[in-house]
């Protein structure tokens, strides 16, 4: 279906929401995230364990250094031109962001759903840490050459108050760079600052989950590509397999159309009662 048709459906949905903001968009929708939350009953064990009750902090591409955080985010631990490759400044102000959780001024070239975790598998661009081979579960099946990260771009699921968001690992932090016992094991975060912060979340992740103020403890775990459900984290980025592969792009559009149709039908049913 054409982009014009999708835009008409979106406009119809917006009008419906303005008329009745309490509408449930997708009741029992199969497209909702299926990644297991730590409090849900499971029919199978997830491939990676949950890290529970972890303090989250926030960061963004292009963030300037501060007294508490002297490192700028124009570059990441794995991308010396992160801001340029992203396409610009990932403005964290919610007023300057769109409904699909991206910065309003441009379409990002990389996935706006990103996180940082406190482990770097590289010493530099020519050498991989010795510990990486020992502690990273997927190392043997993804390693290509010395100095090339096997962590960069890895998918993560974040759970907050019953809602799950997916994002890609894009940088190292907060505060630590070698906390493998926490990132890949069962230990608590080594960092003492910010209430033992153990994960950095991008503005897109923050806004999707609705994290505000000091109520910022979440759960997270690694996820395989095959586990990643439909969601806004599939839409953007040349580093995103769902956005860069035609079959995933097509499937994402079809899912979006189906969700909009279901929302319209749900509203019509409610209106006829």
Positions of PLM-derived features:
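Bacterial N-terminal signal peptides that target proteins for export
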Residues: 4-12
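Secreted/periplasmic proteins
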Residues: 28-273
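Sec/Tat signal peptide C-region and signal peptidase I cleavage site
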Residues: 23-27
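Bacterial N-terminal signal peptides
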Residues: 12-21
